Amino acid sequence: MRLPIILDTDPGIDDAAAIAAALFAPELELQLMTTVAGNVSVEKTTRNALQLLHFWNADVPLAQGASMPLVRPLRDAASVHGESGMEGYDFVEHQRQPLAKPAFQAIRDALMHAAEPITLVAIGPLTNIALLLTQYPECVFNIRRLVIMGGSAGRGNFTPNAEFNIAIDPEAAAKVFHSGLEIVMCGLDVTNRALLAADYLATLPTLNQTGKMLHALFSHYRSGSMSSGLRMHDLCAIAWLACPELFTLQPCFVAVETQGTWTAGTTVVDIEGRLGQPANALVALDIDVEGFQRWAAEVIALAP
């Protein structure tokens, strides 16, 4: 039986690979996509998500979400993904439109009408998830778990200590980690090692149409290089859902710093239990890199 999921995303080049996996991994059933401002503005992430759904002729509804973090100005990652968020490939024109309701409302409606709890997957800033929990706190009972790409038990990639998705909206992340949801955190401890190797990247144009498209996008992705390998941060969250055996997880208490002058957005991951707080997340601390690479190649080969 396929696992029903809702994907909250901010495409984003590595998001495109994650969306492909969410659509074509045989273990998963993508029921709804929502967008959030993050890698680029929400108008651009929505356009990019619609382009991808049209590219794959995917019958998945999409709702546009938050245009700004809860209390802070938006700082994007156009320097990594390009000004459009998905530089490098010319998608064909289409007439697709997002749903006429905001993302948190669309998620709430999908949860409340589902026959069983649904897994949420958030691979961008957590603004939409925080809004959902604020507006509809009763929804926690309809969420099986929340799998996020975000955070780090060590160094950051946006500031010295903070990972991008958490740093963009620390207040949203703090609310989510204190929500009581079952959370799986796939952070930089594993995603920095989740490389697609150069020899595999070179084969993508001959694989299928998806391979051609991803190769064109990856050529403009500034998280690694085509010659040394590219980090697939967002793909890790989907990989854990499809093949959890690839990851080593540890229950930890995770707090999000919201006040620090230099440390805002840092995830304080209490690996050794020094704070005496109960664990509120399962934190991925290790990954089978070769197994991840095999899985990624297999799932991309399943796409058209």
Swiss-Prot record:
GO terms for MF: purine nucleosidase activity
Transmembrane helix keyword on record: no
UniProt-listed Enzyme Commission number(s): 3.2.-.-
Top-level EC class: hydrolase
Location of the active site: 233
Domain of life per record: Bacteria
Gene Ontology cellular component annotations, sorted alphabetically: cytosol
Protein keywords: Glycosidase, Hydrolase
Gene3D superfamilies: Ribonucleoside hydrolase-like
Residues annotated as transmembrane: none
Example of a GO biological process term: purine nucleobase metabolic process
Function field: Hydrolyzes both purine and pyrimidine ribonucleosides with a broad-substrate specificity.
Family under the similarity heading: Belongs to the IUNH family. RihC subfamily.
Protein name per Swiss-Prot or TrEMBL: Non-specific ribonucleoside hydrolase RihC
Organismal lineage: Bacteria, Pseudomonadati, Pseudomonadota, Gammaproteobacteria, Enterobacterales
Gene: rihC
